[in-house]
Amino acid sequence: MTLDLSKPATAGYLSGFANEFATEALPGALPHGRNSPQRAPYGLYAEQLSGTAFTAPRGHNRRSWLYRIRPAAVHRPFEPYAGAQRLVSEFGDSADVPPTPPNQLRWDPLPMPVEPTDFVDGLVTMAGNGSAAAMNGCAIHLYAANRSMQDRFFYSADGELLIVPQQGRLFIATEFGRLDVEPFEIAVIPRGVRFAVALPDGDARGYICENFGALLRLPDLGPIGSNGLANPRDFLTPQAAYEDREGAFELIAKLNGRLWRADIGHSPLDVVAWHGNYAPYKYDLRLFNTIGSISFDHPDPSIFLVLQAQSDTPGVDTIDFVIFPPRWLAAEDTFRPPWFHRNVASEFMGLVHGAYDAKAEGFVPGGASLHNCMSGHRPDADTFEKASVSDTTKPHKVDATMAFMFETRTLIRPTRYALDTAQLQADYFECWQGIKKHFNPEQR
């Protein structure tokens, strides 16, 4: 199977999360019984791509063997990229990262560009924490683009990219094969994997969480049991597909938050076969098996956890990816929307579709909000008043929605861009100012 981004993919996918996959685009391209034969089939080169340390425990060890037309080392030297440099990877105090305010923050959607702009040039960092160089924390980017990548390819050496499209499909051609991703789906591109993005719908906008630390994994289910939340079989990895093209191409690398470019005389998407457990994947959020209360109270949002990146502290993650999908609410004598909250963790939210059930106005698809450690948040005044008098003897379906959250153990620091942009809603705090005083010590 060869790569062709001009039309939808026809190849199927490999099912399962972090499975040991094996796939070949030409029969017999995978060596039999060994990884690095003296001569690989079809004159290919054997190359290992390691996503974890060689000595990581077997259950956490992630690597793949690629059989490609040319090794990844074949390109000209990198030089600083002359295009937009709007990415940040170090979140200590700097010109790019001013002091973090304790205010609740909310943004309108990133505008679509006027000039032709592809996926790489459409990236901008909104917030993050930790350090790409130290391999801990994350960066949260937005993208807005209106042109497919043309004869250029991209990879991030800083972290794995969790991509959440909000508008427009993405045809993502990678070294491992192709992912077609639409809104309501996510894609994860591992650290170091080279790829190109085509925009079949013209305009595209979305969110990215770049994970600098331990790889994303499925959470343990505990008392939920052996099934529920995001089921492993619904994660899809591409089958091998390649292109054998020569010409004047550009390879763009992201390292320590900076973009670099190199000339390359061939397409780096030339992997004819591969096997291993370190590969891109996608997941349809509409397949999430939502858990909730059928008696009383609103459980903690951890019941909506899709993926997590673990820290060195048991039970505390560096990143939690949480969604708020369509679901039934059945709890009686209960305030059904998400409750008022202050959190030791920090929460960056986005909205793919519809409305979020804790906010009646102002939080729109493509927009974002940030509630940092111990900043009070959740229902606005209108939502509280309506939910306080609603009939809870009948189930209610929250429909036509898809919100999500990147939650982190450490402070999420907005960038200078995020604090200065015209999309920042200066009046966000007003949504709570109409909350009334109902207290009456004479009436219980």
From Swiss-Prot:
Family matches, as InterPro entries = HgmA_C, HgmA_N, Homogentis_dOase, Homogentis_dOase_bac, RmlC-like_jellyroll, RmlC_Cupin_sf
Query: Which pathway is this protein engaged in?
Result: Amino-acid degradation; L-phenylalanine degradation; acetoacetate and fumarate from L-phenylalanine: step 4/6
> Which residues take part in binding homogentisate?
Y356, H377
- Which reactions fall under this protein's catalytic activity? homogentisate + O2 = 4-maleylacetoacetate + H(+)
Q: Which GO terms describe its molecular function?
A: homogentisate 1,2-dioxygenase activity; iron ion binding
Question: Listed GO cellular component terms?
Answer: cytoplasm
Per the UniProt entry, what is one GO biological process? tyrosine catabolic process
What is the protein's quaternary organization? Hexamer; dimer of trimers.
- State the protein's name: Homogentisate 1,2-dioxygenase
What species does this protein belong to?
Answer: Burkholderia cenocepacia (strain ATCC BAA-245 / DSM 16553 / LMG 16656 / NCTC 13227 / J2315 / CF5610)
